[in-house]
Amino acid sequence: GADCQNFVYPASTTVVQQVNPVAPVVTEVLNLSADALFKFDGSSLNDLLPQGRVELDNLASNINNVYSQVNKIHLIGHTDRLGSDAYNYQLGSKRAQTVRNYLSARGIPNHVISYSTQGESQPLTDGCYIVKNKQALQQCLQPDRRVTVEITGVKGK
């Protein structure tokens, strides 16, 4: 009867293949204020302010704890318009390089971190040309002094 029926025509089996979804690769862009990181016109490790060290420690911790995979981190140094183009280009590069070295010392693999500079070529302000007082001008141009951090990887641990 029924036993022979199952023997001749076996009950169908369903094979379910479990596929783990691939987490999307995302790029997160952060702007770190150079004024929070460095003394005015500074770019070296010795020029890092206490708050700047805290900010970079938090960034390194965030990268290490939030990302299961880091494909690349690109740092871009920016300056305000004060000073020559050549000087600002160099200053932006030195700031980005200092941030790279700091993150590397905090466990971020050196080979995933690259850096470049835009100098004064990508301001966030309108240049603050109407501001004449030197101290007020430095304050007005503050948003232009920054390091942009572009993190590309997979979030989630």
Q: Where do the PLM segments sit?
A:
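Periplasmic peptidoglycan-binding/tethering modules of Gram-negative envelope proteins
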Residues: 1-72, 136-138, 152-157
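Periplasmic OmpA/Pal-like peptidoglycan-binding modules at the C-termini of bacterial envelope proteins
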Residues: 97, 104-157
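Generic hydrophobic alpha-helical membrane-segment signal
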Residues: 48, 99-100
